């Protein structure tokens, strides 16, 4: 999977609106140095009373998957209804299982460059409940996709600190563990409207102590990976666009390189919307962030 980017989670295309993200962007992503797209799917709202997915929604997804595969990209299908699941853990279960019943059957014959991610950032449930849900969803997938790679992360929003509580079947060697990283939140989420505790802006990042903290945090995950023999995906990381650009770029570069040094694949949050690496209205890369992610794209002059 190597280097990836999160896409289309908040695009109006899913609700019948005019799409910001176009199929042509897959080539742009590939040519921009990325090998993977993590498709952010908020599918529950597109289910009927029997938890069947809307055929039009599925057709839209098919088009995106096929267009990405045509460009040689790996596609992660990420079920991203974590907020709904946190609000009602019991009601989440039948929807999550129905989603994977339908998606695993629909994509059973796709190449192994289509990867399933069972649930983004589980939270609001105990570790035992999430481990049970993950095991049930994995069993559903394995009925039709016995060797497809499946991504599973720990609770508390895919927290590194919760990896030790993640339970994975030892005999299944087609599982990739995932974590997300936004440390320190005071820097990465400064000015974000949904995090009122981080209203202060202008916070810089990049001191030796800052860099050491990133290394120490990722070392915790790497120690778990080595002890458990599981590959890791850094499925999300990013700094909100209210942070100073120079510090955003420095942080992004540091986290991406730290992940690569440890042999992890990664997916930046995100292509469009906020935390962005690509300005769709201007039709151009946000150069400091793009170059931080993909150093080969830096202007040698």
Annotate the PLM regions.
Residues 6, 189, 283-285:
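Domain-start "cap" segments at the beginnings of catalytic or binding domains
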Residues 30, 34-42, 56-61, 65-66, ...:
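Well-ordered, non-transmembrane segments within structured domains
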Residues 1-149, 154-164, 174, 275, ...:
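Active-site mouth of glycoside hydrolases
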Residues 97-210, 215-240, 261-264:
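Active-site region of glycoside hydrolase catalytic domains
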Residues 93-96, 167-171, 194-196, 252, ...:
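Short, hinge-like loop/turn segments at secondary-structure boundaries
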Residues 244-301:
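Aromatic-rich peripheral "rim/lid" segments of glycoside hydrolase catalytic domains that contact
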């Amino acid at each position: 999977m190597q280097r990836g980017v999160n896409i289309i989670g908040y695009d109006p295309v899913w609700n019948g609106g005019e799409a910001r993200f176009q199929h042509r962007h897959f080539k742009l992503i590939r040519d921009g140095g990325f090998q993977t797209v993590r498709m952010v799917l908020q599918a529950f709202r597109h289910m009927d009373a029997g938890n069947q997915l809307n055929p039009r929604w599925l057709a839209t997804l098919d088009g995106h998957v096929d267009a990405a595969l045509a460009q040689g990209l790996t596609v992660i299908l990420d079920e991203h209804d974590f907020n709904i699941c946190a609000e009602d853990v019991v009601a989440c279960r039948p929807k999550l299982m129905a989603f994977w019943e339908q998606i695993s059957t629909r994509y059973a014959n796709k190449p192994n460059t289509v990867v399933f991610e069972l649930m983004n950032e589980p939270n609001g449930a105990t570790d035992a409940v999430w481990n049970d849900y993950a095991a049930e969803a994995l069993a559903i997938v394995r009925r039709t996709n016995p060797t497809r790679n499946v991504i599973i992360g720990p609770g508390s929003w895919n927290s590194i600190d919760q990896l030790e509580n993640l339970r994975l079947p030892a005999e299944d060697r087609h599982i990739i563990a995932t974590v997300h990283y936004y440390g320190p939140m005071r820097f990465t989420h400064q000015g974000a409207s949904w995090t009122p505790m981080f209203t202060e802006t202008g916070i810089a990042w990049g001191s030796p102590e800052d860099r050491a903290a990133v290394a120490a945090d990722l070392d915790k995950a790497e120690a778990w990976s080595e002890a458990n023999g599981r590959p890791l995906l850094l499925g999300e990381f990013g700094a909100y666009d209210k942070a100073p650009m120079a510090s955003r770029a420095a942080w992004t570069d540091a986290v991406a390189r730290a992940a690569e040094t440890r042999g992890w694949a990664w997916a930046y949050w995100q292509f469009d919307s906020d935390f962005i690496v690509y300005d769709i209205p201007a039709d151009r890369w946000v150069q400091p962030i793009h170059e931080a992610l993909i150093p080969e794209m830096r202007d040698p002059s």
